[in-house]
Amino acid sequence: MRALACPASLKGVLAAPLAAAALAEGLRAGGAEARELPVADGGEGTAEVLRLALGGEWREADVHDAFAQPRSARWLLLPDGTAVVESAAAVPLDPERLDPLAASSRGFGELVAAALAAGPEALLLCLGGTATMDAGAGLLDVVGELSVPARVACDVTATLAEAPSIFGPQKGAGPAEVAELERRFAELEELDSVRHTPRGGAAGGLGAALALLGAELLPGAALVLDAARFDPSGYDLVVTGEGRVDATTALGKAPGEVARRSAGTCCVVFGGVVDVAFPGVETVALSGDPAHAREDLVALGRALAVNR
């Protein structure tokens, strides 16, 4: 049996490559031939998923985090000349410091500028996992134009107008701060043309700022799977999943896109926790104990190989 192990990350527990390795270990122990192809939807870790699938070279840059502290960040140059830049590499969300009214996306702009200075053929910008809610104002202070074609992998569909109420609380905003963010966003007249653009709310409004510069906002999971050349043909089994399977898993998340593209092939979706079974696909819950996530995935892979 040929199996494709293509999980997304179990956030805060296992990165997607480690989850894929654990699944593949179990599949091989059960006698299957297994290939590892970790997946992502545009958030943190997307560049590494693409590097594993396509190759490429990491580049380093000195930038500033969301609160103007110096940090080193890296971006990925793919073999075809595309620069892959993650917002979370520069201005990551830090649960120990949540201040959405003060956080700036300037550091992400610095990282994008560093990638552009290297002369890439194109940009693939990955949005998600940031501390920022500044509608991309910091980015726009640094990057005035995109000199090459740019695609943006977004892990949400929310618009700029919706972002404060949806994402503000995740980044530490209480009701008063959400109201202030809504006021600030409303005053950004230069963003009026992209205020209601789907995915413009990604990464605290970075999507809208990039759309203003002419970048194309795309569903992250589909974009990443296309770039990684996901193809289930020739496999007898596809195994995917994430930390929590719920009603949103089928709505643009990476495992949902894997399952959709695997129609006609036996597909199993796992969840560290399963709130809602994935429609029409065998759904398996792990133990739910983060400390045992890796061994759970090894055991799942072995069981799937032995029982099919």
Show which residues each predicted segment covers:
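N-terminal loops that bind phosphate or other acidic moieties
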Residues: 1-308
